[in-house]
């Protein structure tokens, strides 16, 4: 019988297999080998006096690790053999730079690719990574800011490679995983998925290459990912990182990643004519809403009798529904009107990508601005608006106002047409207005309540905000204010401090660890809203008055809609008085809501635009602000329902229905005010 190898020789034998194993297995086995080495060095037998129970356990463990590595080696060999062949569409501008980009990926750890709209960067870069030899030691991961983009990009790459989605190319989004761990090479995912994976594996060992697409959007998720990767590339020298965007601040990103090389790719653009709408005369009353202006613009395009599909950008889902209803009522011949927004069911989203005999009019939010390409678009109608979160440090509130988009976003929208032929972009604002807008939308971290950022970082275990390597670090005072607010709301507990032998806190002693989330704080972190609002809504849910407090919370997020024209102040005050509760402004908000939109409920409050206008004229309210209140209420309701907080009250505890037009606050009055 052959004599067993000593520990040291057996360990060296296992270590010799490491280079040919997949990276994730290599990392896991190395950790276990370190543990075994510590065990053997601490006095475990070496086999010279015959194996005992401890020695057998160690040898068994080494045999197990060897088998694990050999399985991983076989998998790596299969991946090397089965790596898909790739080619690139000749009509894409990025194809002309394929050699330069592949060489940069091979020779540099981090590469920045700045590609204009239509360059093909989103679909071709993962294939360039395969051509550069990546995807064997681990997966090529690519993040997208939206679920619809992740799905459509994965499907497009799979189609170009002659693969079925879920094989060599797959995707993972919330509640849906179509990626094969055994056979997958390219994985497209939302940035939120990668963040979640980083909590379970801080070294992201599954991946040998990561592509962060649309980095110019600078959402909190993207900034969190870039911060994680700034640290990770220093410890994982084998990891390749590509940062890509249509409109990126290349100098800032290159500097953040140690002067990483930048490759610029031009876009494929047929000529696009831009038509502007002149501003109304100063002092003149605006008679048309942006929805009505957009519909008139579509009417004009239809009258031109030139072919091509139409893409209309709207800021909110409510606007999309109203626009679609109005356009369908026009009765255009051989035309199909299709909505597109993030929460639309996937089957309905996919309709916009299909080739149809009818002319398509797609009405979309800014999900259609980047990453996804709706085929056949020749006309773009741009309202120039989006709902952009904004924190006001003076009032300490976060709102979701309708805001003018940046020039960069406007150019992205323009780039959606002119992909297959000359296009026309109709902007429902003036050229002067466009020129006066900022070049980029400020990063979300600069528009956010820092308490919300801190809350999310604690929930994601990202470490202390003061030392996190943000691309644009927040000011120290704002960080302090953020912590102060979270303490006030009961969302975090102060760090425990070191104590002496008698249990007394040592003067000036550092804390054992940073602040931690309370149970309430963890609930708040699950609701992506201003922490003061999420705290209010959690309390309301516990006190069975969530629908009413959602009305109040959304009302507090917009400008007071009540109007008092100088020449009609008495009439306005009389109209407002019918909704006023003498003891509570909050109940007054609920009274207004009930009169206009019906009883508060955790569902969409729908009222036709013409009916809302009539209500506003009669009662001296701003149509624009009432509409904004309605939109914010819908956003909060959707967030609460997604988080599980907005579920219906069980039937056996539901209150008696109230007579129409009446509201008995004897039971709920105190609960509402305690929550608020």
Question: Could you say what each language-model-derived stretch is?
Answer:
Residues 114-116, 485, 522-528, 533-676:
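Extended, charged helical/alpha-beta scaffold domains that provide interaction surfaces
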């Amino acid at each position: 019988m052959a004599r067993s190898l000593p520990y040291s020789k057996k360990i060296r034998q296992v270590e010799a297999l490491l280079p040919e194993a997949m990276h994730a297995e290599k990392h896991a086995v190395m950790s276990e080998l370190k543990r075994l080495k510590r065990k053997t060095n601490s006095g475990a037998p070496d086999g010279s006096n015959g194996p005992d129970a401890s020695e057998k356990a160690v040898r068994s463990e080494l045999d197990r690790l060897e088998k694990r590595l050999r399985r991983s080696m076989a998998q790596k060999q299969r991946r090397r053999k089965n790596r898909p062949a790739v080619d690139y569409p000749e009509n894409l501008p990025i194809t002309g730079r394929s050699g330069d980009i592949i060489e940069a990926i091979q020779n540099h750890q981090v590469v920045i690719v700045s590609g204009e709209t239509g360059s093909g960067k989103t679909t071709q870069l993962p294939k360039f990574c395969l051509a550069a030899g990546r995807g064997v030691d681990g997966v090529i991961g690519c993040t997208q800011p939206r679920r619809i983009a992740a799905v459509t990009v994965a499907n497009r790459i799979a189609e170009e490679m002659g693969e079925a989605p879920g094989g060599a190319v797959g995707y993972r989004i919330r509640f849906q995983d179509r990626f094969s761990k055994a056979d997958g090479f390219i994985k497209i995912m939302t940035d939120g998925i990668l963040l979640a994976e980083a909590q379970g594996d801080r070294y992201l060992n599954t991946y040998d290459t990561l592509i962060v697409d649309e980095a110019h959007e600078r959402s909190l998720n993207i900034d969190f990912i870039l911060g994680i990767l700034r640290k990770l590339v220093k410890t994982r020298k084998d990891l390749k990182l590509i940062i890509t965007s249509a409109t990126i601040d290349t100098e800032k990103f290159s500097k953040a990643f140690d002067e990483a090389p930048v490759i610029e790719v031009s876009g494929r653009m047929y000529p696009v004519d831009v038509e502007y709408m002149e501003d109304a005369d100063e002092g003149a009353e605006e008679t048309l809403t942006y929805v009505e202006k957009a519909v008139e613009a579509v009417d004009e395009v239809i009258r031109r009798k030139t072919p091509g599909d139409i893409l209309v950008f709207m800021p909110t889902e409510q606007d999309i529904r109203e626009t679609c209803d109005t356009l369908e009522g026009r009765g255009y011949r051989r035309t199909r009107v299709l909505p597109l927004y993030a929460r639309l069911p996937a089957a309905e989203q996919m309709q916009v990508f299909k080739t149809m005999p009818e002319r398509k009019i797609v009405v979309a939010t800014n999900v259609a601005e980047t990453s996804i390409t709706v085929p056949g678009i020749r006309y773009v109608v741009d309202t120039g608006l989006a709902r952009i979160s904004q924190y006001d440090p003076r009032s300490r509130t976060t709102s979701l106002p309708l805001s003018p988009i940046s020039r960069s976003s406007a150019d992205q929208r323009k780039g959606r047409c002119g992909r297959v032929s000359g296009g026309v972009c109709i902007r429902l604002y003036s050229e002067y207005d466009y020129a006066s807008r900022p070049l980029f939308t400020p990063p979300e971290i600069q528009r956010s309540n820092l308490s919300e950022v801190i809350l999310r970082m604690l929930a994601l275990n990202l470490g202390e905000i003061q030392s996190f390597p943000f691309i644009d670090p927040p000011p120290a005072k704002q960080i302090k204010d953020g912590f102060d607010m979270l303490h006030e709301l009961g969302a975090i507990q102060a760090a425990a401090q070191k104590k002496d032998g008698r249990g007394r806190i040592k003067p000036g002693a550092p804390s054992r660890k940073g602040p931690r989330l309370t149970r309430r704080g963890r609930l708040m972190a699950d609701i992506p809203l201003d922490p003061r609002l999420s705290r209010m809504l959690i309390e309301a849910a516990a006190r069975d008055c969530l629908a009413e407090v959602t009305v109040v919370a959304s009302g507090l997020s917009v400008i007071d809609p009540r109007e008092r024209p100088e020449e009609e102040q008495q009439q306005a005050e009389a109209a407002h008085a019918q909704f006023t509760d003498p003891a509570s402004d909050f109940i007054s908000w609920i009274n207004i809501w009930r009169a206009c939109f019906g009883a508060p409920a955790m569902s969409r409050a729908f009222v036709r635009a013409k009916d809302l206008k009539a209500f506003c004229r009669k009662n001296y309210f701003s149509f624009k602000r009432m509409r904004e209140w309605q939109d914010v209420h819908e956003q909060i309701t959707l967030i609460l329902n997604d988080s599980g907080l907005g579920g219906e009250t069980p039937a056996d505890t539901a209150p008696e229905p109230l007579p129409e037009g009446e509201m008995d606050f004897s039971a709920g009055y105190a609960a509402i005010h305690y929550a608020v």
